[in-house]
Amino acid sequence: MADTDDTATLRYPGGEIDLQIVHATEGADGIALGPLLAKTGHTTFDVGFANTAAAKSSITYIDGDAGILRYRGYPIDQLAEKSTFIEVCYLLIYGELPDTDQLAQFTGRIQRHTMLHEDLKRFFDGFPRNAHPMPVLSSVVNALSAYYQDALDPMDNGQVELSTIRLLAKLPTIAAYAYKKSVGQPFLYPDNSLTLVENFLRLTFGFPAEPYQADPEVVRALDMLFILHADHEQNCSTSTVRLVGSSRANLFTSISGGINALWGPLHGGANQAVLEMLEGIRDSGDDVSEFVRKVKNREAGVKLMGFGHRVYKNYDPRARIVKEQADKILAKLGGDDSLLGIAKELEEAALTDDYFIERKLYPNVDFYTGLIYRALGFPTRMFTVLFALGRLPGWIAHWREMHDEGDSKIGRPRQIYTGYTERDYVTIDAR
């Protein structure tokens, strides 16, 4: 990205100001607003930050109109087809695809840090068995700050690297233990001869008294889903990680904040909502055309889940990949074909209906992922946990990029105050 002498002129009551244009290598250029308040007395008002770039980033590029998603320049379809999740982790965090030796060293370092401190394992005892796994995940990740105090300084590159490896290694273990806690099953120790995804599946579904062998197709399907979720530039949870980290909070605490943001139903919980919608269509006995009619009737209060996106105004490129994978996995594992059939029929109906076409409502990545997760054996409450596992390398990459900039500032948004002007205090007996 090159900063030049190009400017944009902003006119306001009482004057005008020239603001520097910040050029992107692809996509929208930005207008630097740094001097705006000091020179004009005005600030910008952008609810939801839909038009605000809070950072320069070289990690992920999205063209929502064209349906393009690239990690470090590589198209998502190529990575999903040819790469692995561990390789994509390396790519996002370090900027380039690893060679054979680099990948082996990276994998080996992660494998040596998969276990949790024995005292930390007792942390899970403090949660009720019916606790949702997301607050468990967030709390235990934050608690890593107390158990691994030798790697908390965000300005020490060696400590940042160690905390990076620890998070990549331990989050799958924490996620699996959160699941085991919810079903009353014993924890397993990690098996460092396995890949990251194989280890996670064994920790989640295995038992101490019997061997566990993950189906290679299941491993590949979950690995691919993690790749698709690995980053999506400045979304709510990633922006949260950056904002928390801007105060120089350590990486563990910053990632915990991102997990909390992801738990919100408007962010990470959409795939569960899609599954519930499909089940509702099936159980109601209505056909898809009747459901579509209700969606189009605002007074009916029926929502179409898994369609539309804050960024994409075209078909989400991840959704095409997930749809193909859903066919394969459900055919192999004998998942609920009725729900897949409803999903396909609903997609076809929406893509050919002017109501949805005019509103640019296309399937997003959440539309089919819930079907795959359930076919793999995960309960719906684990869906957002799986999202977090996939998104972790993106969060880490953005946190590190922010600190590597050198001139980063603590995040501190402005506001437009709409409250009372000054008034005098009145004692309680006079109110």
UniProtKB/Swiss-Prot annotation:
Keyword Transmembrane found: no
Transmembrane segments: none
CDD domains registered for this protein in UniProt: EcCS_like
Catalytic activity, EC: 2.3.3.16
Any single GO CC term annotated in Swiss-Prot or TrEMBL for this entry: cytosol
Gene3D superfamilies (UniProt xref): 2.20.28.60, Citrate Synthase, domain 1, Cytochrome P450-Terp, domain 2
Keywords in alphabetical order: Allosteric enzyme, Isopeptide bond, Transferase, Tricarboxylic acid cycle, Ubl conjugation
Pathway as given in its UniProt record: Carbohydrate metabolism; tricarboxylic acid cycle; isocitrate from oxaloacetate: step 1/2
Listed PANTHER family: CITRATE SYNTHASE
Stated family: Belongs to the citrate synthase family.
Name of protein: Citrate synthase 1
Organism: Mycobacterium tuberculosis (strain ATCC 25618 / H37Rv)
Lineage: Bacteria, Bacillati, Actinomycetota, Actinomycetes, Mycobacteriales
